[in-house]
UniProtKB/Swiss-Prot annotation:
Family per record: Belongs to the GPI family.
Active site positions, chain numbering: E352, H383, K511
The enzyme's E.C. designation: 5.3.1.9
One Pfam family in the UniProt entry: PGI
Gene Ontology process terms (BP): gluconeogenesis; glucose 6-phosphate metabolic process; glycolytic process
Role according to the record: Catalyzes the reversible isomerization of glucose-6-phosphate to fructose-6-phosphate.
Lineage start: Bacteria, Pseudomonadati, Pseudomonadota, Alphaproteobacteria, Rhodospirillales
Location relative to the cell: Cytoplasm
Name this polypeptide is given: Glucose-6-phosphate isomerase
Chloroplast as UniProt keyword: no
Any single GO CC term annotated in Swiss-Prot or TrEMBL for this entry: cytosol
Keyword Endoplasmic reticulum: no
Naturally occurring in which organism (per UniProt): Rhodospirillum rubrum (strain ATCC 11170 / ATH 1.1.1 / DSM 467 / LMG 4362 / NCIMB 8255 / S1)
């Protein structure tokens, strides 16, 4: 893939960016009553309004040129064809195959992966429905009331986000919990109030060697065995893994092991066996609807022209702000409490994918890549960090997401929520001029020095860019579309930046060093051999933990 800075479209965008400095968004809107019509797209019941961005028709044309010159279409097609686009690990990237219901073969190393996918989905359907119906019972014959998913990273963030997002579809009386942190507090607090007789554990680890996951799994096993005895493990544990030997040694019946493959990256794995807690929570039909929604977005991504392609547009806008307008962060702001874990999920999906400084050909990048992503559900964020977005010195593009129809239509709650959703995008776009602030203060009775002292604090610069994503309602299909939209956005940006979105070498170094430090914490006779700071902290840990 080419160095993007050598492309003519990149140079044209760099020359174009300064021309927008005297065209703030409020001016662009006032000059063009059809701006919304020109800069929004609808796909089924999902609408992307990108009109409140610092763009003109020329900007979007240049960004489309950049996409074509960067090979966005070719790399997209290579992914769907099963080519090993994860070059540092020599792997295909085929999470999209997991949600493809068509009979068209998908080949990896010459073999069609569709039959294996279908077999695992059938296994998931049978198991999840058995748990939900009460046909699956624990060692004492009681039905399962609580499912505890033990995983970390992609084995946790995706499933917990979806289970929370689809709580309106959950089976009453069947609770799904998630344990990820190796801090013993997490599993200790989760197990409080649970009954071993009615609890099922799902251990999610592809290799069945992940330190955090296996530490928590063994603690859960000890808790269960202490109450029900060793033979109970087989009725109260299932594994989402490929390591049959380790799963069996743990005491799990390999008939209750759900496989996935090395062409499924962790942060893209909720569509695989890792999604079993989703299927148990909301039912397999709703899990299938989630897959179908994602597949619909996959088809749109493959077939829509660049100028009308939702993931491409979102991705290019991110490149525009990061590389040409100096933005180093992005906010994702869902105005739906069910989406309260969306930002955390997208943090991993985006930052672990595109937090890279090395190109596909091993060179250090000379441009900005992935941004810091954060967010909170509205209106909580409004009373937290929106101050900085409105009046701070950093440019932070925002994605606002909301459903038009609430699952909980209580009084005026949803109308108030959506009025804030709409007001924030307008306020960030328009701002408040000094003249407007002066008139407002004067109308409140202020004058003279008091007015002049307060005036600068009441000015909002505006021109803060936002996308608004409005869906009809948050249901499994729509959620699948939304997640796939962001997955493909990430892919588009990685293509433009000429980086690998599908490895994560940055997580390795700390884990390697932790293995060396662990025995030094557990055995005071070992002399630590690190830098003075690390050695000093180890000494303090020994002092404090000794009592």
């Amino acid at each position: 893939m080419p160095d993007p800075t050598t492309l003519s479209a990149w140079a044209a965008l760099a020359a174009h960016a300064p021309t927008l400095s005297d065209q703030p968004l409020r001016v662009l809107f006032d000059a063009d009553p059809d701006r919304f019509a020109r800069f929004h797209l609808r796909f089924e019941d999902l609408v992307l309004d990108y009109s409140k961005n610092r763009i003109t028709g020329e900007t979007m044309a240049l960004l489309a040129d950049l996409a074509r010159q960067s090979g966005v279409e070719a790399r997209r097609d290579a992914m769907f064809a099963g080519e090993p686009i994860n070059t540092t690990e020599g792997r295909a990237v085929l999470h999209v195959a997991l949600r493809d219901p068509t009979p068209t073969p998908v080949l990896v190393d010459g073999a069609d992966v569709k039959p294996a996918i279908a077999a695992v989905l059938a296994h998931m359907e049978a198991f999840s429905e058995a748990v939900r119906s009460g046909a699956w019972t624990g060692a004492t014959g009681k039905a399962i009331t609580d499912v505890v998913n033990i995983g970390i990273g992609g084995s946790d963030l995706g499933p917990v986000m979806v289970v929370e997002a689809l709580k309106a579809y959950a089976k009453p009386g069947l609770r799904v919990h998630f344990v990820s942190n190796v801090d013993g507090t997490h599993i200790a607090e989760t197990l409080k109030g649970l009954s071993p007789e009615t609890t099922l554990f799902l251990v999610a680890s592809k290799t069945f060697t992940t330190q955090e996951t296996l530490t928590n799994a063994h603690t859960a096993r000890d808790w269960l065995v202490g109450a029900l005895g060793e033979p109970a493990v087989a009725r109260h544990f299932a594994a989402l893994s490929t390591n049959a030997k380790a799963v069996s040694a743990f005491g799990i019946d390999t008939a209750n092991m759900f496989e996935f493959w090395d062409w499924v990256g962790g942060r893209y794995s909720l569509w695989s066996a890792i999604g079993l807690p989703i299927a148990i929570s909301v039912g397999f039909a709703n899990f299938r609807a989630l897959l179908d929604g994602a597949h619909a977005m996959d088809t749109h991504f493959r077939e829509a022209p660049i100028e009308r392609n939702l993931p491409v547009i979102l991705g290019l806008l991110g490149v525009w702000y990061g590389d040409f307008l100096g933005a180093r962060a992005q906010a994702v702001l869902p105005y739906d409490q069910y989406l309260h874990r969306l930002a955390a999920y997208l943090q991993q999906a985006d930052m672990e994918s595109n937090g890279k400084r090395t190109t596909l050909d091993g060179k250090t990048v000379a441009y900005a890549t992935g941004a810091v992503l954060f967010g909170e559900p509205g209106t909580n964020g409004q009373h937290s960090f929106y101050q900085l977005i409105h009046q701070g010195t950093s440019l932070i593009p925002c994605d606002f997401i909301a459903p038009a129809i609430s699952h909980n239509p209580l009084g005026r709650h949803h109308a108030i929520l959506l009025s804030n959703f709409l007001a924030q995008t307008e306020a960030l776009m328009r701002g408040k001029t000094e003249a407007e602030a002066r008139a407002e203060l004067a109308a409140q009775g202020l004058a003279g020095e008091a007015l002049e002292a307060l005036l600068p604090h009441k000015v909002f610069p505006g021109n803060r860019p936002t996308n608004a994503i409005l869906v009809k309602r948050l249901d499994p299909r729509t959620l699948g579309m939304l997640i796939a939209l962001y997955e493909h956005k990430i892919h588009v940006q990685a293509t433009v930046w000429n980086i690998n979105a599908y490895d994560q070498w940055g997580v390795e170094l700390g884990k390697q060093l932790a293995k060396a430090i662990l025995p030094e914490l557990e055995d005071a006779t070992i002399s630590p051999a690190h830098d003075s700071s690390t050695n000093g902290l180890i000494a303090l840990y020994r002092e404090f933990s000794a009592g």
